[in-house]
Amino acid sequence: MEKYIKEHTLKPNEIERYGRQLITPDIGVSGQMSLCNSSVLIIGAGGLGCPVALYLSSAGIGTLGLVDYDTVEISNLHRQIGHRESSKGISKAVSLSKTISELNSLIKVNTYETTFTSETAMEIIKNYDIVVDASDNVATRYLVNDACVLTGKPLVSGSALKWEGQITCYNYNNGPCYRCIFPTPPPVETVTKCSDGGVLGPIVGVIGSLQALEVIKILTNNKEGVLSGRLLIYDGMSAVFRTVRIRGKQSGCNVCGDKPTVTQLIDYTQFCQSNYSESAGKVDDRVDKTLIITVEQFNQSIKNNNNNHLLIDVRPKIQFDICSLPNSNNIPIEEIDKKESIEIIEKLIKEKVENNNNNNNNNENRDASDELSVYLVCRRGNKSQDAVKILDEKLKEFRDKFKLLHIKDGLLGWNESIDDSFPIY
């Protein structure tokens, strides 16, 4: 006599592990088997990718793919919960894979320690049923979207910044793709990065968990509840969830429309005028070389003539309060072109010039090295370039009274080249 009857292939240890899902309406045995036989690719093993991967692995997804070229840093740990202090310096994909294996040894995990690019995307995506966009930059979003449309894969997309996050599903059940909603990339200067705007760990946790939930709904064929053609927005500060309708599938879309013009992957860094990583490389020079000084030159200059300079830190006050160089004056870039700020800067310059003149018996013949230098600094040497251009124009009436210079590579450069004890964030 048989001990028990089961008309499915779930093993006893799987029934025990996934039991609470098995008895959930709209999941059941068929739903769990779909999960166990499915494969999901997660682009990004960071703030969003970690909760997505942890919850999908716990749910019993048969195969997970993790794509991330980056390594774990201590600054990641407040929000990237799949990594540990002991993982510092190792691949994020490998680190997250290790955590997943400790959580559920029944599933398979593939790691791709590479940048997701036009050259690698199609070969990786073709092996998976669903793709999750857990990236942090515009170029990757367009790339992932186009690759999913060209391969016919549903895309679950999420994003988070500061206290807010949002999630939707693209290329599913005749719904829109990312290009239907955003045909052209936003101007680079309008995009706020996580490293500049900040983000709370629980926010990416909420959005990542919701992304995992959308994947489960798609794989278990719960079509009606999927966020296709709808955008869910979460405001953590006010504790409000909103779901809004978004533009539907567009017949004129360049990639999923009736007559697509994008039939193969393109150069997305050129298309978006941005990199595949928000931390890729140094900040490019965008001002005349006469307005630039290196951190080494700045350090030597203030050593030689510590009193005859004015240092303006253009970071937001919330960042300035974390740490700053001695004798810095905080005037945020968002306020630097306002009348009140210009008046403050003019007053500071005039006071410095007057003090300098008083210290020189013969001002007309004084050494050029005694000329006042006005230095502008920010976190990475990006916003200080904008500031130097603004002040070069706003203060042109008495520009002959001082040198105006932006500090290349900013405070991160100061940490790397001058003082490694200076806090970075």
From Swiss-Prot:
Annotated positions binding Zn(2+): 177, 180, 253, 256
**Essential cofactor(s):** Zn(2+)
Which pathway does the protein contribute to? tRNA modification; 5-methoxycarbonylmethyl-2-thiouridine-tRNA biosynthesis; Cofactor biosynthesis; molybdopterin biosynthesis
Residues holding ATP = 47, 68, 75-79, 92, 136-137
EC number, UniProt record? 2.7.7.80, 2.8.1.11
In the record, biological process GO terms are: Mo-molybdopterin cofactor biosynthetic process; tRNA wobble position uridine thiolation
For this UniProt record, the keywords arranged alphabetically read as follows: ATP-binding, Cytoplasm, Metal-binding, Molybdenum cofactor biosynthesis, Multifunctional enzyme, Nucleotide-binding, Nucleotidyltransferase, Transferase, tRNA processing, Ubl conjugation pathway, Zinc
Q: Which GO terms describe its cellular component?
A: cytoplasm; cytosol
Q: How and how many cofactors are bound, per the record note?
A: Binds 1 zinc ion per subunit.
Annotated GO molecular function terms are: ATP binding; metal ion binding; molybdopterin-synthase adenylyltransferase activity; molybdopterin-synthase sulfurtransferase activity; nucleotidyltransferase activity; thiosulfate-cyanide sulfurtransferase activity; URM1 activating enzyme activity
> Where is the protein localized?
Cytoplasm, Cytosol
Please list the residue ranges annotated as the Rhodanese domain: 305-423
Q: Which HAMAP family match?
A: MOCS3_Uba4
Entry function: Plays a central role in 2-thiolation of mcm(5)S(2)U at tRNA wobble positions of cytosolic tRNA(Lys), tRNA(Glu) and tRNA(Gln). Also essential during biosynthesis of the molybdenum cofactor. Acts by mediating the C-terminal thiocarboxylation of sulfur carriers urm1 and mocs2a. Its N-terminus first activates urm1 and mocs2a as acyl-adenylates (-COAMP), then the persulfide sulfur on the catalytic cysteine is transferred to urm1 and mocs2a to form thiocarboxylation (-COSH) of their C-terminus.
This protein is called Adenylyltransferase and sulfurtransferase MOCS3
Q: Which organism is it from?
A: Dictyostelium discoideum
Give the organism's phylogenetic lineage.
Answer: Eukaryota, Amoebozoa, Evosea, Eumycetozoa, Dictyostelia
